[in-house]
């Protein structure tokens, strides 16, 4: 499933379209190499699974994926989880059931729950909003018109924080070289020890690369 592709492409472009920022031009987008680029590209299952882990442990507290069915975690060519693994993951969430008029544990046929903490946008279609290459199922023609795609933008955004901050009108903004206008209201989401992978991969640059893939 394209949406759970890398590690964090999940914090998509449109994702920041609703974030407040100080005026300015377009930001710098690094040309990352993704395995799924171009008509012959393929998805890296391990990368997608890491991306889901980053989303679950870092992003999901503020951002939902309400248009993504949980069952897609078992898609062939995507994350490839077993039915049992998908059911176990689904139970991590609670969803509102209109028939019960109450919340219950999610099942694979449900979608990821919506999360709108602090007005944070849903990530379901964010990467698509700035898509260039659409993985092995697309032609890449969009990139010729729109420049580098959603995965590159998201990975660049996640790694583009400079550490500089400023306060305007009672709000704190963070300098980010990839964000249009250079100043974004979202604090850096990735730190050195925020996610532990089974294979000991924990570098911010790689973790940003993977979520980006995951969401495309």
Each model region followed by its residue ranges:
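Short cysteine/histidine-rich zinc-coordinating motifs and their immediately flanking basic loops
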Residues: 71-76
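Membrane-proximal low-complexity regions enriched in glycine and acidic/polar residues
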Residues: 93-180
């Amino acid at each position: 499933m394209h949406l759970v592709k890398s590690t964090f492409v999940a914090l998509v472009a449109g994702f920041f379209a609703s974030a407040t920022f100080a005026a300015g031009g377009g930001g710098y987008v690094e040309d990352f190499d993704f395995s799924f680029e171009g008509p012959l590209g393929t998805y890296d299952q391990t990368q997608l699974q890491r991306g889901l882990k980053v989303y679950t442990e870092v992003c999901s507290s503020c951002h939902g994926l309400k248009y993504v069915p949980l069952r897609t975690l078992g898609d062939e060519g995507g994350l490839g989880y077993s039915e049992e693994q998908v059911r176990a993951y689904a139970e991590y969430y609670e969803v509102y059931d209109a028939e019960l008029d109450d919340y219950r544990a999610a099942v694979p046929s449900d979608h990821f729950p919506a999360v709108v903490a602090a007005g944070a946008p849903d990530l379901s279609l964010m990467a698509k909003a700035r898509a260039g290459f659409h993985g092995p199922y697309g032609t890449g023609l969009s990139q010729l018109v729109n420049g580098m795609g959603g995965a590159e933008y998201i990975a660049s955004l996640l790694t583009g924080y400079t550490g500089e901050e400023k306060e305007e009108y009672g709000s704190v903004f963070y300098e980010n070289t990839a964000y249009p206008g250079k100043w974004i209201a979202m604090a850096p989401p990735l730190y050195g020890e925020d996610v532990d992978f089974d294979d000991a991969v924990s570098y911010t640059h790689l973790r940003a690369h993977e979520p980006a893939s995951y969401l495309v």
